[in-house]
Every structure is written in C-alpha cells, then in structure tokens.
C-alpha cells in the first residue's frame, strides 16, 4: 500500500530503446525523394523517402530500434530518423514555395519580355508583363517544392531585379523626352 500511495514501485522497461539517426541529404535528394539504407544492430533497413523532404522532418519506424536488453519477447524500440536538407545557393525554400531572383535591364521590365530562368527542374520560360517594376514577384503555380506524400507542389516565385546600364548622352536625351511626354500627358 505504501508503494502504491507514494510511487515507490519501479517501472520496468517495456520495450527496447529507440535508435536516433541524423540523415543529411542534398536539396535535390530532398526534392526528388530517395531510397536510404540504415544498418541497425547488424540488420539493414531500407527506407523509401517520397519527394518533398524538409529540413527538421522526423520519421518514426516502429519496432526497428534496439531489442530489449533482457527479454527478447518484448518489442524492439523505434528507429527515429531526423532529416537535414542542405540549403541550395540558387533557390530559397519557404514552405513549399521556391524563391529565385532574376536580373533584367530596366527597359525590359518596363516593356515586358520573355525570360528563361533556372529552376530545380531545368530551364523554364516566363513572361514578364509590360509595366512591371523592379522587385515585382512573378508566381508560377505547381513549379515549386513537392508537398511530402502528396501529388502536389508549391509555387515558383521569381523576384525581378532591375539592372541599370551606363547610359550615353543620346540615351539620356531619349529618357528626357519620355519624361517630358509623360508629364505633358498627365497634365
């Protein structure tokens, strides 16, 4: 009775210990998914990871950890896999969206144009609409990072940055004419 009231009874371990593993993968492996082999207690475990692995994601494989140290009839612990997805210098991952930046001459931003940008899937043609502005973000649906375990992807977000070439006297005169025409049109 005393032990029951004050918790003096020791709890016994009901299963083996969990095994924790840190798994480092590249951005491309995380995006495309991969098969990975783990060796636990001399046994090889094959795990298939679907496309869309994220940094910090945890996976628990029940019964794939350590056996119970004293009783082989009790269940094994679990294998806990903690993922680390390396950053990519060309792409910024934000949720399931991938951000990229593209530099364009200011006149192409104003007039509009077609550009080709590098994505994790390769080159992609994008239309920059006329009357765009520096810092504008173009959103392309379903071209971002895969959503883990689903047949779905985030968006590709392309931020347009302006470049300003050195202008000669004639170019500056054209700009002055455009400015003058615009001021007259606005009254």
What do the PLM-derived regions correspond to, one by one?
Residues 43-44, 48-187:
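Intrinsically disordered, low-complexity linker/assembly segments
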Residues 1-39, 68-75, 80, 182-187:
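Post-J-domain flank of DnaJ/Hsp40 co-chaperones
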């Amino acid at each position: 009775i005393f032990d029951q009231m004050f918790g003096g009874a020791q709890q016994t371990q009901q299963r083996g210990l969990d095994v924790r593993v840190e798994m480092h993968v590249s951005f491309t492996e995380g995006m495309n998914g991969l098969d990975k082999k783990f060796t636990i207690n001399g046994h090889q475990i094959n795990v298939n990871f679907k496309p869309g692995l994220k940094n910090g994601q945890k996976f628990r494989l029940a019964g794939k950890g350590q056996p119970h140290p004293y009783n082989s009839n009790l269940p094994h612990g679990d294998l806990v896999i903690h993922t680390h997805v390396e950053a990519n210098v060309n792409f910024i991952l934000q949720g399931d969206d991938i951000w990229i930046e593209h530099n364009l001459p200011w006149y192409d931003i104003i007039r509009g144009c077609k550009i080709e940008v590098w994505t994790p899937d390769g080159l992609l043609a994008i239309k920059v609409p006329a009357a765009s502005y520096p810092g504008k973000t173009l959103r392309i649906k379903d071209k971002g990072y895969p959503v883990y375990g689903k047949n779905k992807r985030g968006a590709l977000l392309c931020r347009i940055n302006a470049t300003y070439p050195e202008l000669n006297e004639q170019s500056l005169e054209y700009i002055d004419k455009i400015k003058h025409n615009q001021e007259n049109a606005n009254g």
